[in-house]
Amino acid sequence: MSDRVKITPMTLNFGPQHPAAHGVMRLVLEMGGEVIERIDPHIGLLHRGTEKLIEYKTYLQALPYFDRLDYVSPMCQEHAYSLCVEKLLKCEIPIRAKYLRVIFCELTRILNHLLNISSQALDIGAMTPLLWMFEEREKILGFYERASGARFHSAYIRPGGVAADVPDDLIDDIFKFIKTFPKFIDDVDELLTENRIWKQRNVDIGIVSKEQALDWGFSGPMLRACGIPWDLRKSQPYEIYEDLEFEIPIGKKGDCYDRYLVRMAEIRQSIKLLEQCLNRLPNGPIKTDDRKIAPPKRSEMKESMEALIHHFKLYSEGYSVPIGETYMAVEAPKGEFGVYIVSDGTNKPYRCRIRAPGFAHLQAIDMMAKGHMLADLTAIIGSLDIVFGEIDR
């Protein structure tokens, strides 16, 4: 009689209520013992019909929907939408507004990567980074609140500029924060990067080759971890990125460990970008002077009838956008976040298509996890950096 144990294939449901699923994700796993043979992701549990809802809102009213897509890094999505509308309007925004946008987008990148690295570590069993990193995230959310009045859904970056100017003491506090923050990142680096257990759980897990990454439509840290130095801030510069100096961190193998290293390096590059922006931040207006697009100041409305009419018309009817269609993408923390708008010349978008980076990454999970152990699946999901607000839309 053979000593070999006959393993019967088993179907396993992972999620939709599971702490390592990073939201409402259901995976149907076909297991051969403890080895994954096939993964079938079921998405759509957080579908809210965002793209359709936008068609019934004015261009300004549609903005808050973008905060609620990838709710971990909201400002980058507002940015993509605002750039898209501005392109259709052929609207130029003041240089100070461009600097403020880049400052908050880079703070958002740090915010996103802190959450991803800490939750990836927690999924694998390291609890300390989560407690450390959430303390730093709170500081950045405090900057959000002081600039816009909201910690998460800020609606700060708007077509025509930014919602409001930042107080001088906020700029000073961000500067103080980025002076002490690199020391904190060094501590996290020391805690995780060469940690034996961390490396055992991440090295050679979920390997993706350059060819596979391009075939699946990867972008952001997922693509750069495979060794492809593609970053929209360099390849298709927008705002003031072409005037700033920074490097594109890339990986070698394209495994979970490389994805972690790329995100850690990106945090350091964001600090470098923030330092340059804060040192160069010019004075001046923060909105376009076209009162059909950006509202007038409150003080103007008390004296000028035209300003009051502009304000009323902007917040009741909105502005009409010329007929046309355009696509605009930004380098969001998770990858290429794109917005495609078709305008029919009215005050509402005829069609708004959203390109979420997480969707392309999640569809490749079967290819990444096949042949791995069930325990490795949490490491792979953690390294994907998925948020279901943007995937399900």
Curated annotation (Swiss-Prot):
It holds the Pfam family Complex1_49kDa. It is a peripheral membrane protein. Keywords: Cell inner membrane, Cell membrane, Membrane, NAD, Quinone, Translocase, Transport, Ubiquinone. It is found in: Cell inner membrane. Its EC number is 7.1.1.-. It catalyses: a quinone + NADH + 5 H(+)(in) = a quinol + NAD(+) + 4 H(+)(out). GO terms for cellular component: plasma membrane. NDH-1 shuttles electrons from NADH, via FMN and iron-sulfur (Fe-S) centers, to quinones in the respiratory chain. The immediate electron acceptor for the enzyme in this species is believed to be ubiquinone. Couples the redox reaction to proton translocation (for every two electrons transferred, four hydrogen ions are translocated across the cytoplasmic membrane), and thus conserves the redox energy in a proton gradient. PANTHER family: NADH DEHYDROGENASE [UBIQUINONE] IRON-SULFUR PROTEIN 2, MITOCHONDRIAL, NADH-UBIQUINONE OXIDOREDUCTASE 49 KDA SUBUNIT. Signal peptide: none annotated. It comes from Ehrlichia chaffeensis (strain ATCC CRL-10679 / Arkansas). HAMAP family: NDH1_NuoD. This is NADH-quinone oxidoreductase subunit D. The keyword Transferase does not apply. InterPro entries: NADH_Q_OxRdtase_suD (IPR001135), NADH_UbQ_OxRdtase_49kDa_CS (IPR014029), NDH1_su_D/H (IPR022885), NiFe-Hase_large (IPR029014). Gene3D superfamilies: Cytochrome-c3 Hydrogenase, chain B (1.10.645.10). Its main location: membrane. SUPFAM superfamilies: HydB/Nqo4-like. It is an enzyme of class 7 (translocase). One of its GO terms (molecular function) is NAD binding. Belongs to the complex I 49 kDa subunit family. NDH-1 is composed of 14 different subunits. Subunits NuoB, C, D, E, F, and G constitute the peripheral sector of the complex.
